[in-house]
A protein has these predicted regions:
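Conserved ABC ATPase "signature" region
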Residues: 5-22
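Conserved ABC ATPase signature
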Residues: 27-31, 35
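Conserved catalytic motifs of ABC-family nucleotide-binding domains
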Residues: 48
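Catalytic Walker B motif of ABC-type/P-loop ATPase nucleotide-binding domains
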Residues: 52-55
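Helical segment within the ABC ATPase nucleotide-binding domain
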Residues: 67-80
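A short, surface-exposed alpha-helical micro-motif characterized by mixed small hydrophobic
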Residues: 94-96
């Protein structure tokens, strides 16, 4: 692809995630956490893929910016007609961007279902995790210093 065409596509995708062309001239260290997430999303959609992978898309963001990123993910995915696979520990994010959820525990899938059914999964591991309780079948090891 010609450099000019790639730059034009980059500016369009940056605009899709609410960033102006001036962001393209900045170094990564000059971007805020939210801007970095937006640039990452623009990069992910640049080739208009059929499948997009997200790894902790809202990690390190305050709840408001996390919600902004979730909205952008939902909008971009809808506009592209893409399928996504997201890995997250952020239940607010999972509830907003997912249609279906799978929970893994110790490398095994222990529950799969529609996000609308996660609160009534009947799975004690899922229940403990989504409610953020220390007590339950998931035991966290704490090592002495």
């Amino acid at each position: 692809m010609a450099r000019d065409k790639a730059r034009d596509i980059a500016f369009v995708k940056l605009a899709n995630v609410g960033l102006g062309p001036e962001v393209g001239a900045l170094h990564p260290a000059e971007l805020s956490g939210g801007m970095r997430k937006r640039v990452g999303l623009a990069r992910a959609i640049a080739t208009e893929p059929e499948i997009i992978f997200f790894d902790e898309p809202t990690t390190g963001l305050d709840p408001i910016m996390g919600d902004v990123i979730n909205d952008l993910i939902v909008d971009c995915v809808r506009d592209l007609g893409a399928t996504t696979l997201s890995i997250t520990h952020d239940m607010a994010s999972a509830r907003k961007i997912a249609d279906r959820v799978a929970m893994l525990y110790r490398g095994e899938i222990i529950w799969v279902g529609p996000v609308s059914e996660i609160d009534d999964s009947g799975n004690e591991y899922v229940d403990q995790f989504i409610n953020g309780r220390a007590e339950g079948p998931i035991q966290m090891e704490v090592r002495a210093l």
